[in-house]
């Protein structure tokens, strides 16, 4: 592990620089400005020797008269190049953050569904916001400070060597000890930084869950529990931050001690070796001034190390995410709408190499017909609906669309043929019109209104203050459950896809609304292949075929009346919902 760390750091730097490369002209200008800034500082230190020697030892009136002009020009130029360097480096950093955030977001959007099953929204937000921001500190603040201070250190050491190389060599003997201290804190800070990122993800996750589920939190009296949980996470985060601070303190104090020993050694050497080393008062004071000036950049470089390590840990987290494989998306691009014939052939499926959820599932949905999936929770209904648009890849078997295996179609082409209305409605913090037209951004206002009318949403939309331009709030919080569901149905109607997936599409509606929506859906379903998932069997009586699932296997198929005549699983489920009676032997 120890040997791999420098190699890993170099690889991270190299990969990070690939994002900086497009902005190299501005970066180069910023680097040159910072080098000039450090050169001016080192030049002022060398001028100390001339000021003393030519102003007090051997007086040079011409030089003395030039001192105010030298100081004015030097300080003015120093301020200008400092501002230029800071602006250029910040511009590069924010540009890198923008590109990296866009890349991370685009990658997350295209990750397979099983990744979302394991990762929380808080963890993902932490990567986009916190981890990428740590990378910004490496590519701007840290880089600026590093260039300025390393150039200043080199400049000051050069000044010392020019003035008196013998004393300067003595000081250089302290460098290996500084390296030992920095190397130790490098590893410690990187390790702690990974913990800091993890705790930030936990803090974001806890806050996100509590805010989104505030109704449940309040009705079940969970405020104190959530506050305690959040406080524990923030306290753990604080402790990790303090560990980083301790590492910084050890770094700074250790380096300052080494430099102090170096300065003391040089002063003693200058006193005891005065007969061997000839040096003027101005030169001696200039060397001492240079050594004292070295303390600040050396201190900055050592504290900078913690920032760099946090940034590298952030980069590692971001790049690990970017290395995750995307959804497999190689296949044919369909230019026309399909007819909509669906066939499942010997389909098996397991999540993440676990036990099979589906076992040898076989059925056909003729184009333009409706098929309903029924069964107890966990029987595999939603899994079947998720396999069709390839949210998950099959473990075994084949699903065909108009005779073509869905794996041979591009994801965009495949999903373009489908509309979805699920039990958990997703609305965006945008206008009602834009929510209905989601995925059909070229739709006219007339088309949007027509879809809303078919979904029985037009009436309540017109009663809102801004009508179709009313913003719905985060996830449609300003709408009732039934209203949100009708907007989702209007969205599916507007897409006008040949395949319609209804996952408990009427579950959030009251009886009156459900009656209207059911009538609207029957009209929309005409000529479309429709896959219906429902718990309320009264809503699927008119489906062309009903498939009964139990423990991931198909146990019955047929029309509503045919299944009732069988007096099997479906008949028992129907009796339970209609009359509250059940034959336990049949359902088990």
From Swiss-Prot:
<dbReference type="GO" id="GO:0005524">
    <property type="term" value="F:ATP binding"/>
</dbReference>
<keyword id="KW-0812">Transmembrane</keyword>
<dbReference type="InterPro" id="IPR011527">
    <property type="entry name" value="ABC1_TM_dom"/>
</dbReference>
<keyword id="KW-0445">Lipid transport</keyword>
<keyword id="KW-0067">ATP-binding</keyword>
<dbReference type="GO" id="GO:0034040">
    <property type="term" value="F:ATPase-coupled lipid transmembrane transporter activity"/>
</dbReference>
<dbReference type="GO" id="GO:0016887">
    <property type="term" value="F:ATP hydrolysis activity"/>
</dbReference>
<dbReference type="InterPro" id="IPR003439">
    <property type="entry name" value="ABC_transporter-like_ATP-bd"/>
</dbReference>
<dbReference type="GO" id="GO:0005886">
    <property type="term" value="C:plasma membrane"/>
</dbReference>
<dbReference type="InterPro" id="IPR017871">
    <property type="entry name" value="ABC_transporter-like_CS"/>
</dbReference>
<feature type="binding site">
    <location>
        <begin position="375"/>
        <end position="382"/>
    </location>
    <ligand>
        <name>ATP</name>
    </ligand>
</feature>
<keyword id="KW-0547">Nucleotide-binding</keyword>
<feature type="transmembrane region" description="Helical">
    <location>
        <begin position="23"/>
        <end position="43"/>
    </location>
</feature>
<comment type="function">
    <text>Involved in lipopolysaccharide (LPS) biosynthesis. Translocates lipid A-core from the inner to the outer leaflet of the inner membrane. Transmembrane domains (TMD) form a pore in the inner membrane and the ATP-binding domain (NBD) is responsible for energy generation.</text>
</comment>
<keyword id="KW-0997">Cell inner membrane</keyword>
<keyword id="KW-1003">Cell membrane</keyword>
<keyword id="KW-1278">Translocase</keyword>
<dbReference type="Pfam" id="PF00005">
    <property type="entry name" value="ABC_tran"/>
</dbReference>
<keyword id="KW-0813">Transport</keyword>
<dbReference type="Pfam" id="PF00664">
    <property type="entry name" value="ABC_membrane"/>
</dbReference>
<dbReference type="InterPro" id="IPR027417">
    <property type="entry name" value="P-loop_NTPase"/>
</dbReference>
<dbReference type="InterPro" id="IPR011917">
    <property type="entry name" value="ABC_transpr_lipidA"/>
</dbReference>
<feature type="transmembrane region" description="Helical">
    <location>
        <begin position="56"/>
        <end position="76"/>
    </location>
</feature>
<comment type="similarity">
    <text>Belongs to the ABC transporter superfamily. Lipid exporter (TC 3.A.1.106) family.</text>
</comment>
<feature type="transmembrane region" description="Helical">
    <location>
        <begin position="257"/>
        <end position="277"/>
    </location>
</feature>
<feature type="transmembrane region" description="Helical">
    <location>
        <begin position="141"/>
        <end position="161"/>
    </location>
</feature>
<feature type="transmembrane region" description="Helical">
    <location>
        <begin position="162"/>
        <end position="182"/>
    </location>
</feature>
<keyword id="KW-1133">Transmembrane helix</keyword>
<comment type="subunit">
    <text>Homodimer.</text>
</comment>
<protein>
    <recommendedName>
        <fullName>ATP-dependent lipid A-core flippase</fullName>
        <ecNumber>7.5.2.6</ecNumber>
    </recommendedName>
</protein>
<keyword id="KW-0472">Membrane</keyword>
<dbReference type="InterPro" id="IPR003593">
    <property type="entry name" value="AAA+_ATPase"/>
</dbReference>
<feature type="transmembrane region" description="Helical">
    <location>
        <begin position="278"/>
        <end position="298"/>
    </location>
</feature>
<feature type="domain" description="ABC transmembrane type-1">
    <location>
        <begin position="28"/>
        <end position="310"/>
    </location>
</feature>
<feature type="domain" description="ABC transporter">
    <location>
        <begin position="342"/>
        <end position="576"/>
    </location>
</feature>
<dbReference type="InterPro" id="IPR036640">
    <property type="entry name" value="ABC1_TM_sf"/>
</dbReference>
<dbReference type="GO" id="GO:0015421">
    <property type="term" value="F:ABC-type oligopeptide transporter activity"/>
</dbReference>
<dbReference type="InterPro" id="IPR039421">
    <property type="entry name" value="Type_1_exporter"/>
</dbReference>
């Amino acid at each position: 592990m120890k040997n791999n760390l420098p190699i890993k750091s170099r690889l991270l730097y190299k990969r990070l620089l690939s994002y900086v490369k497009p902005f190299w002209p501005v970066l180069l200008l910023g680097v040159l400005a910072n080098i000039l800034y450090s050169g001016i500082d080192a030049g002022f230190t060398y001028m100390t020797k001339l000021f003393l020697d030519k102003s007090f030892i051997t007086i040079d009136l011409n030089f003395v008269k030039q001192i105010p002009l030298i100081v004015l020009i030097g300080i003015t130029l120093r301020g200008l190049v400092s501002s230029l360097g800071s602006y250029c480096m910040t511009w590069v950093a924010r540009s890198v953050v923008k590109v990296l955030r866009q890349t991370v977001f685009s990658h997350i959007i295209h990750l397979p569904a099983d990744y979302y099953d394991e990762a929380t929204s808080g963890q993902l937000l932490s990567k986009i916001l916190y981890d990428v921001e740590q990378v910004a500190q490496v590519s701007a603040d840290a880089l600026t400070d590093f260039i300025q201070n390393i150039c200043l250190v080199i400049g000051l050491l050069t000044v010392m060597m020019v003035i008196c190389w013998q004393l300067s060599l003595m000081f250089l003997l302290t460098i290996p000890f500084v390296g030992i201290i920095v190397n130790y804190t490098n590893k410690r800070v990187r390790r702690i930084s990974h913990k800091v990122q993890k705790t930030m993800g936990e803090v974001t996750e806890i806050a996100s869950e509590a805010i989104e589920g505030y109704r449940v939190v309040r009705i079940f009296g969970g405020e104190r529990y959530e506050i305690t949980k959040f406080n524990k996470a923030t306290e753990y985060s604080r402790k990790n931050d303090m560990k980083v601070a301790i590492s910084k303190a050890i770094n700074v104090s250790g380096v300052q001690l080494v430099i102090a020993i170096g300065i003391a050694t040089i002063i003693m050497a200058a006193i005891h070796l005065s007969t061997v080393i000839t040096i003027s008062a101005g030169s001696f004071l200039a060397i001492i001034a240079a050594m004292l000036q070295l303390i600040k950049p050396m201190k900055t470089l050592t504290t900078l190390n913690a920032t760099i390590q946090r940034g590298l840990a952030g980069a590692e987290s971001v790049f690990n995410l970017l290395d995750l494989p995307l959804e497999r998306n190689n296949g044919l691009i369909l230019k026309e709408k399909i007819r909509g014939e669906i066939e499942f052939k010997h389909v098996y499926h397991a999540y993440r190499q676990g036990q099979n959820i589906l076992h040898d599932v076989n059925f056909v949905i003729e184009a333009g017909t409706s098929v309903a999936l029924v069964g107890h929770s966990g029987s595999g209904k939603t899994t079947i609906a998720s396999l069709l648009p390839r949210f998950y890849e099959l473990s075994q078997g084949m699903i065909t669309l108009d005779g073509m295996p869905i794996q041979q179609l591009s994801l965009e082409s495949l999903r373009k043929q489908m509309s979805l209305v699920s039990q958990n409605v997703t609305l965006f913090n945008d206008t009602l019109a834009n929510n209905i037209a989601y995925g059909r951004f070229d739709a006219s206002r007339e088309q949007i209104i027509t879809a809303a009318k078919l979904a029985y949403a037009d009436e309540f939309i017109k009663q809102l203050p801004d009508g179709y331009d009313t913003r719905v709030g985060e996830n449609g919080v300003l709408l009732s459950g039934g209203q949100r569901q009708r907007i989702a149905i209007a969205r599916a109607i507007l897409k006008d896809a040949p395949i319609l997936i209804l996952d408990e599409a009427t579950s959030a509606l009251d009886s009156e609304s459900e009656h209207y929506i059911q009538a609207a859906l029957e009209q929309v379903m005409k000529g479309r292949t429709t896959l219906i998932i429902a718990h309320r069997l009264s809503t699927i009586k008119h489906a062309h075929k009903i498939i009964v699932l139990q423990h991931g296997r198909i146990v019955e198929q047929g029309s509503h009346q045919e299944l009732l005549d069988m007096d099997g699983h479906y008949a028992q489920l129907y009796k339970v919902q209609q009359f509250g009676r059940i034959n336990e032997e049949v359902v088990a």
